[in-house]
């Protein structure tokens, strides 16, 4: 009887942790919504892996190569926790949108020619990358932490959003903050830094040229 009980308990534990794989077809863009945690993993195939317990709380739609991932759980948790998470395996990825408190991250380099990142409403993107060009925008308290290498880039932080790119090696970069945004940035050749209506741009490293423009307040700082 005890052996039977242990077997039943073991099966329940196994089933509760079983993973489900979804073949969503090829995609090069992703959009995440509503406090969901998404790990990006480079792969030879495109797929989404999730826990079976989360399957009923996640909607996945691939429309014209743009994969939308949404948490449909009505009872959302605190800002420091995520009840629903998925792993996204991708072949090529050049655009990431994080919305409504979602969290997107990678532990391995995302390699592409051009990368576009957008985050809003308290969302977070933490990405390691190797690219030629990046466009990154944050709004409404969203944050980004970017690491790796990019030849050129355009970074924009609005309305309390923040971009930490001091560990992303640029040759040339444009950094613009509006209405209380914050950007930490590093480049070897040129930084074009602009502040409007408050906010700060903090410049790391020793770029050869720094072009500063301030309108209606804000700070541009050289960090040694």
Question: Which residues are covered by each model-predicted region?
Answer:
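Intrinsically disordered, low-complexity terminal regions
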Residues: 1-224
């Amino acid at each position: 009887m005890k052996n039977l009980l242990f077997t039943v308990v073991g099966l329940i534990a196994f089933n509760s942790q079983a993973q489900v794989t979804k073949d969503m077809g090829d995609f090069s863009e992703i959009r995440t919504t509503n406090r969901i945690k998404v790990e990006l993993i480079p792969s030879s195939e495109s797929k989404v892996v999730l826990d079976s317990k989360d399957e009923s709380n996640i909607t996945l739609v691939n429309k014209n190569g743009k994969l939308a991932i949404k948490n449909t759980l009505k009872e959302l948790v605190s800002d420091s926790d995520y009840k629903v998470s998925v792993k996204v395996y991708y072949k090529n990825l050049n655009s990431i949108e994080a919305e409504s408190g979602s969290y997107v991250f990678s532990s391995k380099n995302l390699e592409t020619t051009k990368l576009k990142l957008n985050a809003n409403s308290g969302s977070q993107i933490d990405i390691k990358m190797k690219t030629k060009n990046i466009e990154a925008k944050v709004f409404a308290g969203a944050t980004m932490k970017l690491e790796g290498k990019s030849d050129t880039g355009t970074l924009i932080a609005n309305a309390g959003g923040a971009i930490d790119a001091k560990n992303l090696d640029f040759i040339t970069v444009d950094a613009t903050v509006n209405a209380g945004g914050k950007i930490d940035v590093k480049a070897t050749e040129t930084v074009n830094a602009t502040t409007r209506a408050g906010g700060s741009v903090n410049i790391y490293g020793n770029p050869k040229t720094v072009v500063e423009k301030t309108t209606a307040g804000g700070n541009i700082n050289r960090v040694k």
